[in-house]
């Protein structure tokens, strides 16, 4: 499986609690912070919840 580079590009002010929880689970706390996670269905599900707050790139 590949890897996903997930970058937060919007803040969490006014976000719903489940979106805040998803961001914390992904390991994102600050704007422009990036993390690399494995491309698994559970990570894809977390990204789907916060797709409007992050950008996702595939990394080899």
Swiss-Prot record:
Keywords: Ribonucleoprotein, Ribosomal protein. GO terms for biological process: translation. Pfam families: Ribosomal_L30. The keyword Ribosomal protein applies. CDD domains: Ribosomal_L30. PANTHER family: LARGE RIBOSOMAL SUBUNIT PROTEIN UL30M (PTHR15892:SF2), MITOCHONDRIAL RIBOSOMAL PROTEIN L30 (PTHR15892). This is Large ribosomal subunit protein uL30. It comes from Saccharopolyspora erythraea (strain ATCC 11635 / DSM 40517 / JCM 4748 / NBRC 13426 / NCIMB 8594 / NRRL 2338). The lineage of its organism: Bacteria, Bacillati, Actinomycetota, Actinomycetes, Pseudonocardiales.
């Amino acid at each position: 499986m590949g890897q996903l580079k997930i970058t937060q590009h919007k803040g969490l002010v006014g976000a719903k609690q489940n979106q805040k929880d998803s961001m914390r689970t992904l390991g994102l706390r600050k704007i422009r912070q990036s993390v690399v996670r494995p491309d698994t269905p559970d990570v894809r599900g977390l990204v789907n919840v916060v797709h409007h707050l992050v950008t996702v790139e595939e990394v080899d």
